[in-house]
Regions:
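Catalytic, metal-anchored helix/loop core of enzyme active sites in primary metabolism
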Residues: 1-383
């Protein structure tokens, strides 16, 4: 039986991971759960799954969490340092990195050092410090299995293949709720509109990133590190139906793709059961009901965030870290009504210009870069 730690268990990926566990109680046991501050749901999960340990990142919730679980033999931890230590516990086999944003970097690094298998949903970890993560995974011989639907599709399409035969990766994007909006219309869209994704059910932050196509930019960077492939061999295709989750084109001209209904439990389960496939109750894809599959080139004028992601990756160094930090600032500001939709790209671009560039950053450099870029982005928002 695999012992699982879920970082970010109260978020969209975390709750769907627990759905997978419910389907296969004979195979998976929840050893550890963590949340940022969603204490009520964390308590509910702890009561259902009876983990050995729970951790709340926001230390102000430590006492009420302890009180709520006082009758159970569950160890309660709090704080970012405790979270990074929790993932190294010997009993844990798999760490599901489902935390949102930069906060997922340190615990993922510690889990790799402890030689845990990583089921990676936190794409920001590879965006911020892909080179370090790649180096550590190779050093400690740790498997990093993708949970993102697109990267899982590529991963599945590569089974039995040699990377030398890969011509390019085809990364699909739904285009989000504003795919058919004009540039003028996009100036006035609201957070409420952006949060209505046409195909996928996700958390608030990633849904906004999807609407701005920054999420797809992050996925390009993530794919570069996961599959050790140059960025110029990663092509983004807008595919509104979200049926083809992504594909691989080979040197002989053939293309392998993974298709399915838009349900994150599929890639989550595959990451947990790889290399095997197990039964699942997700809805089956009805190809007779699928009227058409269409593909378009992304419009970089209306979605400049995708171009900024390519620019950051091509420049390298700490620039993807700058991209991520600035995006986290403007994403929250947009959700809170302090930033316009198209203004987000402007702030990110200017932050990339103003933040000190470091060619070969260390972990400490990434920490400082994150702080500097956030400060610059916040100052730009005030103007």
């Amino acid at each position: 039986m695999k012992q699982i730690a879920i970082l970010g268990s109260t978020g969209s990926i975390g709750t769907q991971t627990l759905d997978v566990v419910r389907q296969h109680p004979e195979a998976f046991s929840v050893y550890a759960l963590s949340a940022h501050r969603s204490i009520d749901l964390l308590i509910k999960q702890a009561l259902e799954f009876n983990p050995a340990v729970v951790c709340i990142a926001d230390e102000t919730y430590y006492r009420p969490l302890c009180e709520a679980l006082s009758d159970l033999p569950i160890r309660v931890l709090a704080g970012k340092k405790a979270l990074a230590e929790m993932v190294t516990m010997p009993a844990i086999d798999v760490v599901v990195a489902a935390m949102v944003g930069y906060a997922g970097l340190r615990p993922t690094i510690e889990a790799i050092k402890a030689k845990k298998t990583i089921a990676l949903a936190n794409k920001e970890t590879l965006v911020v410090a892909g080179e370090i993560i790649d180096r550590l995974a190779k050093r400690y011989k740790v498997d990093i299995l993708p949970v993102d639907s697109e990267h899982s599709a590529i991963f599945q399409s590569l089974v039995g293949e040699d990377m030398i035969s890969v011509e390019k990766l085809l990364l699909t994007a739904s285009g989000g709720p504003f795919r058919n909006f004009t540039l003028e219309q996009m100036q006035y869209v609201t957070a409420a509109e952006a949060l209505r994704h046409p195909n996928w059910e996700m958390g608030a932050k990633i849904t906004i990133d999807s609407a701005s196509m920054m999420n797809k930019g992050f996925e390009v960077i993530e794919a570069r590190w996961l599959f050790d492939i140059p960025v110029d061999k990663i092509q983004v295709l807008v595919h509104p139906q979200s049926v083809v989750h992504s594909a691989v084109q080979f040197v002989d001209g053939s293309v392998k793709a993974q298709l399915g209904t838009p349900d994150m439990r599929m890639p989550i389960q595959y990451a947990l059961t790889y290399p095997e496939r197990w039964m699942s109750d997700v809805a089956r894809l009805d190809l007779f009901a699928t009227q058409s599959l269409t593909f378009e080139e992304p419009d970089l004028k209306r979605f400049p965030n995708l171009a900024l992601a390519y620019e950051a990756m091509n420049k390298g160094g700490n620039m993807p870290c700058v991209l991520n930090a600035a995006n986290e600032v403007v994403n929250l500001a947009f959700r809170e009504g302090r930033c316009g939709f198209m203004q987000m790209s402007d702030v990110i671009a200017k932050t990339m210009e103003k933040t000190m560039f470091i060619t070969e950053p260390t972990y400490e450099d990434y920490v400082q870069t994150d702080k500097e870029a956030r400060k610059i982005a916040l100052e730009l928002l005030k103007r």
